[in-house]
Swiss-Prot record:
Record-annotated J domain positions: 3-73
Organism: Rickettsia bellii (strain OSU 85-389)
GO molecular function: ATPase activator activity; protein-folding chaperone binding
Family the entry assigns: Belongs to the HscB family.
PROSITE patterns hit by this protein: DNAJ_2
Stated name of the protein: Co-chaperone protein HscB homolog
Bridged cysteine pairs (disulfide): none
Amino acid sequence: MQNYFELLGLEQIYNIDLKILEKQYFAMQIKYHPDKAKNLQEKEQNLIIASNLNKAYSTLKDSLKRAEYMLLLYGVNLNDEKVRSKLSALELSIFWDEMELIENTSSYKSLEEIKSKYELMEKAEVNFLAESFKKQDLSDATIKTSKLKYIHTLLSKLQEKMKLCK
């Protein structure tokens, strides 16, 4: 499998310009559209390339997926128990407390306030991640990615809860 950054002609950095990513993606989709193929073999190749472009785009446009993918490129597997245990017991306890808070909150307005707080935390964590990758501090990038994953989980839970409260 080709490196997603290379496939889309992008520099392998965390803090990518999403407008350039989108521009590159659409340009490549046009170039390798299966309907533009001259024969069956080329059409099959273009289908594979188009599929890889879709995977690359969906991975790189999402801050969490991009971080996980970059760590994977550096040989860090977040599913490894040693890697997952890098978050402190206190951080995990806070996460579970926040999950419980969401579960027990029934006011839509309160949920919106919690959501705003986590959206700010998400932005901050993405900025910290960009710095960690820039310094190639994989240990810190791993911890920041784990935190970002927990924030995404909380935001997802909030979205579900907010739908029920409407």
